[in-house]
Regions:
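A short, glycine/small-residue-rich beta-strand->loop->alpha-helix junction that serves as a flexible
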Residues: 8-26, 97-101, 230-233
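Short alpha-helical donor nucleotide-sugar binding micro-motif in glycosyltransferases
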Residues: 293-299
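Conserved acidic donor-binding segment of nucleotide-sugar-dependent glycosyltransferases
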Residues: 339-340, 344-352, 360-366
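Short hydrophobic beta-strand element within catalytic cores of glycosyltransferases
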Residues: 324-327
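Aromatic "clamp/platform" in nucleotide-sugar-dependent glycosyltransferases that forms part
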Residues: 307
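Membrane-proximal helix-turn-helix segments that form the acceptor-binding/catalytic region
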Residues: 110-114, 140-171
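A short, active-site helix/loop in glycosyltransferases that binds the activated sugar's phosphate group
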Residues: 44, 154-194, 202-204
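Nucleotide-activated donor-binding/catalytic signature segment of Leloir-type glycosyltransferases, i.e.
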Residues: 266-286
Length: 396
């Protein structure tokens, strides 16, 4: 009889299937033989009943009219998720949760009460800098009313996180730096023997079937993929950089949905730089991953100047097609570039460093063919078929 693997992801949407919270349930089913399920409110109403062996359990969000003015309203909205968990906890062998958080605590608490022998796996989706900042707030003495209330809020969150840790059987961290820092304790709670370094990966079951273009076949394309215009993705830095560069025979493709706040910025940018309209192309969101992979396959260079990332899955996908990656110094930058061996790490928000590196690419100062070969060799470390075996070894 197959074991059941359930991932709770309240706002899961179709495009997330290619991300870690979609890939892990898929590969747990395809490679390890689990009966995988994802429990969600299907907020965008875009999910099938089944995808690659993963069953989507879609429940209605309760009290949707409530705003999140208090923490209890968030819990109230999850009523139907809690209801499903209460009814089915005994039949769930492995419960996968995202983030060490107060919300994860309540899922874990209910699950362990009803199925004490069940296995809880928390994928941290972890940003070390954010954790250190939050923990400093919790640990320090407030110097103002504002700091007092902020500490009170963070302390309430961390009190539940501390109670979550003992219930958890396994916590994985995406970057080696985060893993080394967190492997023995979380907020002072012992985690020895229950942590794992597990980077995010790429869907090699699909990508390995695609003929990757040779370095010579690729086009002079610089690519970025993500939620364009959000504060995290720092798209404005990329555009401000590009207007300072002679792109020559290169083009830049920006793939992804555009944040509403960024639309006017984009329009003004092209009004002020009309010569770049044919050089810088916004494609819009591409939900069909096979279509998205065509862009990776055409491109030589992938750039992601984010202000923060827990990992940056799109960079690993780009590497699977031999792209030279230029990334800001976010959490997993060293893991992805093999400590700058196959890619370039620039300072966050540094237009000067980004200009310099892109100019080196365009002037052929960087041997992209050599980087291409090294990248394709290194990226095998991020195949999900390999990563899932590593995870499976730790789940009893």
């Amino acid at each position: 009889m197959k074991k059941t693997f359930l991932h709770i992801s309240e706002e899961f949407e179709y495009t997330w299937l290619g991300k870690d919270n979609g890939m892990i349930p898929i590969y747990m089913s395809e490679k390890l033989g689990y009966e995988s399920k994802i429990l969600t409110v299907n907020l965008k109403n875009d999910l099938p009943d089944n995808e690659r062996g993963v069953e989507f359990i879609k429940v209605k969000r309760k009290f949707a009219f409530l705003s999140n003015f208090a923490y209890w309203t968030k819990l109230a909205k999850r009523y139907n998720i809690f209801k499903y968990l209460i009814r089915n906890a005994k039949n769930i062998d492995v419960l996968m949760l995202f983030h060490v958080s107060r919300c994860s605590y309540w899922y874990a608490y209910i699950y362990k009460k009803l199925n004490p022998n069940g296995f809880i796996y928390v994928k941290a989706d972890f940003n070390l800098a954010v954790y250190q900042k939050e923990w400093n707030i919790v640990s320090s003495k407030p110097k103002s009313f504002r700091e007092f209330f902020r500490k009170r809020r963070e302390s309430a969150e961390y009190n539940k996180r501390k109670k979550l840790i003992p219930m958890t059987d396994l916590i994985s961290y995406e970057s080696l730096e985060a893993y080394e820092f967190m492997k023995d304790s979380y907020a002072g709670i012992d985690t020895k023997g229950k942590t794992l370094y597990l980077p995010n990966g790429y869907d090699n079951e699909i990508i390995d079937k695609i003929k990757v273009k040779t370095s010579e076949e690729k086009e002079n394309i610089i690519l970025t993929v993500g939620r364009l215009g959000t504060e995290a993705k720092n798209t404005e830095l990329l555009l401000e950089t590009l207007k300072e560069i002679d792109l020559k025979d290169w083009k830049v493709y920006l793939v992804g949905s555009i944040d509403k706040s960024f639309i006017s910025y984009k329009e003004n940018f092209f009004k002020e730089n009309p010569s770049l309209i044919d050089k810088i192309i916004f494609t819009g969101e591409i939900k069909d991953r096979k279509e998205l992979y065509k862009y990776y396959n055409r491109a030589k260079v992938f750039v992601l100047p984010s202000r923060w990332e827990s990992f940056g899955i799109v960079m690993v996908e780009a590497m699977a097609f031999g792209n030279y990656v230029i990334t800001s110094n976010t959490c997993a930058a060293k893991d992805i570039t093999n400590n700058s061996e196959i890619g370039k790490i620039v300072k966050i928000d540094s237009k000067e460093e980004l200009i310099k590196e892109l100019e080196r690419v365009i002037s052929r100062e960087i041997n992209l063919k050599e980087k291409y070969e090294k990248t394709l060799n290194y990226v095998s470390n991020f195949k999900y078929s390999n990563l899932i075996e590593k995870l499976g070894e730790r789940i009893r």
